[in-house]
């Protein structure tokens, strides 16, 4: 069984299974829901089996490689493979998508298209993290965009068309830079065109050309992550999307930007990355404070959480730019941690809306008593988001901070200034999160209003919240459980960055 194309099966299963959804009867909403959930569970089990029995975690090299000719005219190969850097995002994608499918249970309008788009998005995301061909990477990047656009524009709020259009303009604009960079890198050189990541990683470019390549890919990944000032699509998108779509957006697409920065900008273009890394650190540190302050001024609950996400991504940017093993490990852990915590917060914001029919904090108050379960879960994940010790966010942010302080690349003055800015950001995060909790769950406004929609969490909501909370606690108490997945790969990347 080890000879089976496991990665190909994992990549194509969701979209191929989703293609059969239109064959289901029009009134078979429950059948469609259970079928989609079953496909997600099957995918998760296949992924778990493959990683458990066919992947060696102490090997930093690419494993489970598959290479098939696809389009000879442009030398495009179906080339897949994974290493420690891929395994975390793929596992996160599978886990969050399965729970988002369960979270989407109340969706009744055109569920066949809704669940097909979720499965198509699933394939695109897993395919991107498993790609070993830069053009295939671009195609998977594009495959993920259209489902997200349709999910926002068809199942969003009142301003869904504006938000969906803004999302597609930003991300499609970034895709242009990826396509240009991928084709240019593939065609450069005297030994013939190649799109293989492994070969591209060993190519050497003139300094100016490498900087041009780096900036092109950086713009695309900066939009996705997002990085200031290319972040404005994110609050609008989260503010209008259905909460199951928000779970997917918070859990995975943002991580595609961080993954791309490491996989392409850092691994394929190390010299340019070394030149730009101080600017990454500065921008990341500023982003932590700016987004935290902006979050504090938001009246809409989902927009406040969205800006909090932008602030947390600042730690990822600092970690990638720090040029230190500890910080890069922390940045990857922060992506995984935020994928879980962010998905949970948006899910709970959505379930709160189902009960109170408003997202504006000015009209919310006193929810702690009538909605005690939601209050408990929301408070728990908010503590995780503000990096409470014992939870995954604390470990990730502490590693990034420690890494920048001990980095060999920067002067002591630079390290102290950046560490001080990050520390201020870590103080601002509890301020805007605790302020949000105070306004939502305490006070008197809501208690004096008779609301026929008022309801607390049911078994489904509690189950999803517990499933997301357990890995947050597990990673916070025993971080080596996940750090061991990619620490060897991080060592290899940093060794190459300092010795080439």
Curated annotation (Swiss-Prot):
Name the chain's protein: NAD(P)H-quinone oxidoreductase chain 4, chloroplastic
* Top-rank taxon: Eukaryota
Q: Where are the transmembrane segments?
A: 4-24, 31-51, 87-107, 111-131, 134-154, 167-187, 207-227, 242-262, 274-294, 305-325, 330-350, 358-378, 386-406, 416-436, 462-482
Q: Which catalytic reaction applies to this protein?
A: a plastoquinone + NADH + (n+1) H(+)(in) = a plastoquinol + NAD(+) + n H(+)(out); a plastoquinone + NADPH + (n+1) H(+)(in) = a plastoquinol + NADP(+) + n H(+)(out)
> What subcellular compartments does it reside in?
Plastid, Chloroplast thylakoid membrane
Alphabetical keyword list: Chloroplast, Membrane, NAD, NADP, Plastid, Plastoquinone, Quinone, Thylakoid, Translocase, Transmembrane, Transmembrane helix
* Similarity remark: Belongs to the complex I subunit 4 family.
Q: Which Pfam families match?
A: Proton_antipo_M
Q: Which residues form the signal peptide?
A: none
Q: Which GO terms describe its molecular function?
A: NADH dehydrogenase (ubiquinone) activity; ubiquinone binding
Q: Cite the HAMAP family for this sequence.
A: NDH1_NuoM
Membrane protein topology class:
Multi-pass membrane protein
Record's InterPro entries? NADH_Q_OxRdtase_chain4, NADH_Q_OxRdtase_chainM/4, NADH_UbQ_OxRdtase, ND/Mrp_TM
Q: What is its EC number?
A: 7.1.1.-
What does the record list as GO biological process?
ATP synthesis coupled electron transport; electron transport coupled proton transport
Major localisation: plastid
Give the CC-aspect GO terms: chloroplast thylakoid membrane
Q: Which organism is it from?
A: Cycas taitungensis
């Amino acid at each position: 069984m080890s000879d089976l194309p496991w990665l190909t099966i994992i990549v194509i299963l969701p979209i191929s299974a989703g293609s059969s959804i239109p064959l289901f009867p029009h009134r078979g909403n429950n059948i469609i829901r259970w079928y989609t959930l079953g496909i997600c569970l099957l995918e998760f089990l296949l992924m778990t089996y493959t990683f458990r029995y066919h992947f060696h975690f102490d090997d930093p090299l690419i494993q489970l490689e598959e290479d098939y000719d696809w389009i000879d005219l442009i030398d495009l190969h179906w080339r897949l493979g994974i290493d420690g850097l891929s395994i975390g995002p793929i596992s996160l994608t599978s886990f969050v998508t399965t729970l988002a499918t369960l979270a989407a249970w109340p969706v009744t309008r055109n569920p066949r298209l809704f669940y097909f788009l979720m499965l198509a998005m699933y394939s695109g995301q897993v395919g991107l993290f498993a790609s070993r061909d830069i053009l295939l990477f671009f195609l998977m990047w594009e495959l993920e965009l259209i489902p997200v656009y349709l999910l926002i524009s068809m199942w969003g709020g009142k301003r869904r068309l504006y938000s969906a259009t803004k999302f597609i303009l930003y991300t499609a604009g970034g895709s242009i830079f990826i396509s240009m960079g991928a084709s240019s890198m593939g065609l450069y050189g005297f030994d013939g065109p190649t799109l293989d990541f492994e070969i591209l990683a060993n190519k050497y470019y003139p300094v100016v050309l490498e900087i041009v390549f780096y900036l092109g890919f950086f713009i695309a990944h900066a939009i996705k992550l997002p990085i200031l000032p290319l972040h404005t699509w994110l609050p609008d998108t989260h503010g209008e999307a259905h909460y199951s779509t928000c779970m997917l957006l918070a859990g995975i697409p943002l991580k595609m930007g961080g993954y791309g920065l490491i996989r392409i900008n850092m691994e394929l273009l190390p010299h340019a990355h070394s030149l730009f890394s101080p600017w990454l650190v500065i921008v990341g540190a500023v982003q932590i404070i700016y987004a935290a302050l902006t979050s504090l001024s938001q009246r809409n609950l989902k927009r406040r959480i969205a800006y909090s996400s932008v602030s947390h991504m600042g730690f990822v940017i600092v970690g990638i730019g720090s040029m230190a093993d500890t910080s890069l490990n922390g940045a990857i852990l922060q992506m995984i941690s935020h994928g879980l915590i962010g998905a949970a917060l948006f899910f709970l914001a959505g379930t709160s809306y189902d009960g109170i029919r408003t997202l504006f904090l000015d009209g919310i108050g006193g929810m702690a008593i009538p909605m005690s379960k939601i209050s408990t879960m929301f408070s728990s994940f908010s503590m995780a988001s503000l990096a409470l010790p014992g939870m995954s966010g604390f470990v990730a942010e502490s590693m990034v901070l420690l890494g920048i302080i001990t980095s060999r690349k920067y002067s002591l003055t630079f390290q102290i200034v950046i560490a001080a800015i990050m520390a201020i950001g870590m103080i601002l995060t509890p301020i805007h999160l605790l302020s949000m909790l105070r306004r939502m769950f305490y006070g008197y406004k809501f208690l004096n209003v008779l609301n026929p929609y008022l309801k607390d969490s049911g078994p489904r909501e509690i189950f999803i919240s517990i499933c997301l909370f357990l890995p947050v606690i597990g990673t916070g108490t025993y971080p080596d459980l996940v750090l061991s997945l990619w620490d060897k790969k991080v060592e290899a990347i940093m060794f190459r960055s300092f010795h080439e």
